[in-house]
Design a protein with these regions (language model features):
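Conserved SAM-binding loop and adjacent beta-strand
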Residues: 249-264
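Alpha-helical transmembrane segments of multi-pass membrane proteins
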Residues: 1-219, 227-233, 242-246, 258, ...
Length: 314
């Protein structure tokens, strides 16, 4: 139950990040993700209780967990084409991000989470030997599962996603549950966690293609999904999450962008007669405005503040 707790909440965090390049990371997307996980767990608890009475054996439980691990490992590989098609379809019918993200989470993570949800009542049924200590047994098992969920939440958000990305985060949680499940099955089922481990070593594919140009860099930062798109003329755009807005622009032959960033060069002169001695940029992004100021006003001291340090590195 500890391993399943880790994987369940870890998958929830990773699922929300999986939605970000397509539907953003708004409260609506998070609400849909949490709601789908809770519904899937509820159905899993109910179904797991029935399965526990019909098949009160460890191999049956481990087989279910192993199947859930396989489904979880497949999620990042089917998400890009599926979510891209879903986004195009929902844009065509003007349904919006709420229905789009809800459908995406339902289709991708509901089934593996439901199957993991069967573990709690099933494991309690196997662990319970006497009615006298049934309450203590159930309480201990749920406590173990909850501690695992806490660990999975923090591991996904603070460690795995920033360090290895969303795809390998799903694979890591799938590997954890597959290893635990394989211990209760015959030796040949060890091939499943071995296969998942092999996928972990495989190169990470493109998270989301662009119809404007070539994606030359992608990153899952602590705060968001970021990518750099290079247009046919060499201009580069920094896009975050769903990419509806351009957050920074780079042109190889000029610091001017032809966009809103150029306005910051002249705005100080509405109240000053000379270039400012010092400016502060809150939300520096990839440094578009700072680069322009350094070119046109080299004597101006620039303080660029960006909460997401990886954008500065980009």
């Amino acid at each position: 139950m500890f391993a399943v707790g880790i994987a369940t909440l870890g998958a929830e965090i990773a699922a929300a990040r999986l939605m970000a390049p397509f539907f953003g990371d708004s409260t609506i997307v998070w609400a849909n993700t949490i709601a789908v996980v809770l519904v899937a767990l509820s159905v899993g608890y109910w179904f797991g209780g029935r399965m526990a009475d019909r098949h009160p054996t460890l191999p049956a439980l481990c087989g279910t967990v192993l199947a859930a691990s396989v489904l979880m490992a497949l999620v990042p590989f089917v998400s890009d084409p599926f979510l891209s098609l879903s986004l195009d379809a929902f844009d065509t019918y003007s349904v919006g991000g709420f229905a789009g993200s809800l459908f995406g989470v339902l289709a991708l993570v509901a089934l593996p989470v439901l199957m993991l949800g069967t573990v709690s009542p099933w494991a309690i049924r196997l662990k319970m030997h006497a009615i006298e200590d049934s309450g203590e047994t159930a309480g201990r098992m749920y406590a173990i599962s909850t501690v695992g969920s806490l660990l999975g939440t923090f591991a996904a958000s603070l460690l795995l996603i920033p360090l290895v990305g969303t795809q390998r985060t799903f694979l890591t949680f799938a590997l954890i549950t597959a290893l635990v499940a394989a211990l209760g099955l015959r030796m040949r089922w060890v091939l499943v966690p071995v296969a998942i481990a092999a996928l972990l070593a495989a190169p990470v594919g493109l998270v989301k293609a662009s119809d404007k140009g070539e994606v030359i860099h992608e990153a899952d930062t602590e705060y968001q999904y970021a990518r750099v798109v290079e247009l046919p003329d060499g201009e580069r755009h920094l896009e975050l999450n769903e990419g509806l807005a351009v957050h920074s622009v780079y042109r190889p032959d000029t610091v001017l962008t032809g966009g809103v960033w150029d306005g910051y060069l002249i705005e100080p002169f509405s109240v000053l007669d000379a270039p400012p001695e010092r400016i502060a940029i809150l939300g520096n992004g990839a440094g578009t405005t700072a680069r322009a100021y350094a070119e046109y006003f080299p004597d101006t001291l620039i303080d660029g503040v960006e909460i997401d340090g990886e954008l500065h590195d980009i």
